[in-house]
Amino acid sequence: MTKYIFVTGGVVSSIGKGIVAASLGRLLKNRGLKVTIQKFDPYINIDPGTMSPYQHGEVYVTDDGAETDLDLGHYERFIDINLNKYSNVTTGKIYSEVLKKERRGEYLGATVQVIPHVTDALKEKIKRAATTTDSDVIITEVGGTVGDIESLPFLEALRQMKADVGSDNVMYIHTTLLPYLKAAGEMKTKPTQHSVKELRGLGIQPNMLVIRTEQPAGQSIKNKLAQFCDVAPEAVIESLDVDHIYQIPLNMQAQNMDQIVCDHLKLETPAADMTEWSAMVDKVMNLEKKVKIALVGKYVELPDAYLSVVEALKHSGYVNDVAIDLKWVNAAEVTEDNIKELVGDADGIIVPGGFGQRGSEGKIEAIRYARENDVPMLGVCLGMQLTCVEFARNVLNLHGANSAELDPKTPFPIIDIMRDQIDIEDMGGTLRLGLYPCKLKSGSRAAAAYNNQEVVQRRHRHRYEFNTKFREQFEAAGFVFSGVSPDNRLMEVVELPEKKFFVAAQYHPELQSRPNHAEELYTAFVTAAVENMK
């Protein structure tokens, strides 16, 4: 029988529910259980694919092409699993499916209501996530906080699950803030008490509390929360602020969180062996050398827009025994006159993905600087496309060269829309999304990075591609297309082999990086940056 764990939040949003859920998932996996995890987002968008990064952070793409919440990146990195489209569910997606069923007559003339139709659809998503992965345990995180009007159907579905599958197969974990008032010199439990009261008013009694706090709460605070919130004292778990998020599973294990969960769900498993994870954390905590990487991006005011990029750089730093000293450079502010001032002290430059005209010329300047000064450079998605544009302008002398996305009237559309995208009008969910194979050129930097594999599978999110009409012209000038689709239609990886490291990929390698298995292209880039350290 599949076991279901539901993680809710109270008091404030962005409290770390996703990290708590991911940490628990890691502990349960290391107990020998097969774990999957999903995120419920109560917003009305179908998915975050068309949302501004300033609103939502990065869009995380799964193997099967779902555009999802950035928390799925935490889930995959912590638990080291590949999730699918059932791992992110929004209000918009549920209502869209319910309304389509109504139009098809599948409700046989019934009045379509939140209960049972919407809640049934939500429960079906929970169960489908478990069955499609054949998991022993599924962890479901509900976005937002208890009390949000948007969350009510989701919480009602969670309440019903207990009756549907039995109390021994369901566990509710509530994450709240435990604020410390300096003026009073004490921690305040009332916000948590009121949050639990609100949750109980919706029919859900939490079995465990996870309290986010800046300093240890002490047993007396835990006992007070246990008494007023009707949970066992040992089931009040502290989530202390830490220097590195990968410490959190170890902190949770030290408080017997996973054992309490297994006892409640009647799961008999050996203790989680976290030796390898602990060794990784010890290494992370004791890195002495730093390598400076300049990230030239459009959305640098909100680092969450590049969350997976940053994590992949960190993972590759672990492999190279260095910490990443990240220098955020706003591409919109980069010019030919100030580029040296902005990135001249960097050991490596990364130009990540993005959409739209703003900042594109600044990214091109950064790529030019890297090429002309032989600074290790990694381009990703739009970064790869602009690498081609920069080469066309400044090496091939194709003045006015650009991407047709950025300048539809360019005389040299080095990057053009994919053929199967031409007649598509909808923006959401219509990009080239998900896992695709890339055939690597023997002897190339890309092939060397991937241990001389002939083919790698990587995740994509783009609508435009390199225009192959220009391929011969590029190759004649020494530009190497070191990764292509198996049918040779799509240019996936480009490089200049005479440089220390000048490689760009159309796909998003960062989406498959893990703390205990860094993505290979990122690792090759960081290695080159370390060798270039000033």
UniProtKB/Swiss-Prot annotation:
Task: Please tell me which top-level EC class this enzyme sits in.
Answer: ligase
CDD domains given for it? CTPS_N, GATase1_CTP_Synthase
- Binding of L-glutamine occurs at 54, 354, 382-385, 405, 463
One Pfam match, by short name?
CTP_synth_N
E.C. designation(s): 6.3.4.2
User: For the Glutamine amidotransferase type-1 domain, which residue ranges apply?
Assistant: 292-534
Q: Has keyword Nucleotidyltransferase?
A: no
- Positions of CTP binding: 13, 148-150, 188-193, 224
State whether keyword Magnesium applies: yes
Give the binding site residues for UTP.
Answer: 13, 188-193, 224
Note the Gene3D superfamilies from the entry: 3.40.50.880, P-loop containing nucleotide triphosphate hydrolases
The protein's UniProt keywords, in alphabetical order, are: ATP-binding, Glutamine amidotransferase, Ligase, Magnesium, Metal-binding, Nucleotide-binding, Pyrimidine biosynthesis
Kindly list the GO molecular function terms attached to this UniProt entry: ATP binding; CTP synthase activity; glutaminase activity; identical protein binding; metal ion binding
* Binding locations of ATP: 14-19, 71
Similarity section = Belongs to the CTP synthase family.
Biological role: Catalyzes the ATP-dependent amination of UTP to CTP with either L-glutamine or ammonia as the source of nitrogen. Regulates intracellular CTP levels through interactions with the four ribonucleotide triphosphates.
- HAMAP family, from UniProt? PyrG
Q: Any miscellaneous information on file? A: CTPSs have evolved a hybrid strategy for distinguishing between UTP and CTP. The overlapping regions of the product feedback inhibitory and substrate sites recognize a common feature in both compounds, the triphosphate moiety. To differentiate isosteric substrate and product pyrimidine rings, an additional pocket far from the expected kinase/ligase catalytic site, specifically recognizes the cytosine and ribose portions of the product inhibitor.
Instruction: Write down what this protein is called.
Output: CTP synthase
What is the scientific name of the source organism? Answer: Streptococcus agalactiae serotype V (strain ATCC BAA-611 / 2603 V/R)
Instruction: List the top taxonomic levels of the source.
Output: Bacteria, Bacillati, Bacillota, Bacilli, Lactobacillales
